Amino acid sequence: MAPQIFVVQTTLPSTWIEPEVGAFAQSLLEAGAACIQHSSIRSTYRWEGKIESSEEWRLELKVSQEAVDGVLSALRKQHPYSTPQITYWKAESSQEYADWVDSA
């Protein structure tokens, strides 16, 4: 079986500026994430009976199996949305990358 890591995704408000997103990401690194990529996206979704479209920040985290519970707990505790998108799954990776994620 190929080595596995966790990939975690969430979104943050577009009203946040880059340093705020960076500080949020830093707190998740301190909670155990190995790597966090963030980028600006446009989301279209249903909210309170209406179809909405807005810009947001997407964060994608790479996390070891040992650290995932702590990272998810920190993410839930610190997230600014009342109903945050927090999705996560196991992903196969190269042995070298999994080793790096585990050691980060």
Enumerate the language-model features and the residues they cover:
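Positively charged, small/polar-rich N-terminal and surface patches that mediate targeting and assembly
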Residues: M1-A104
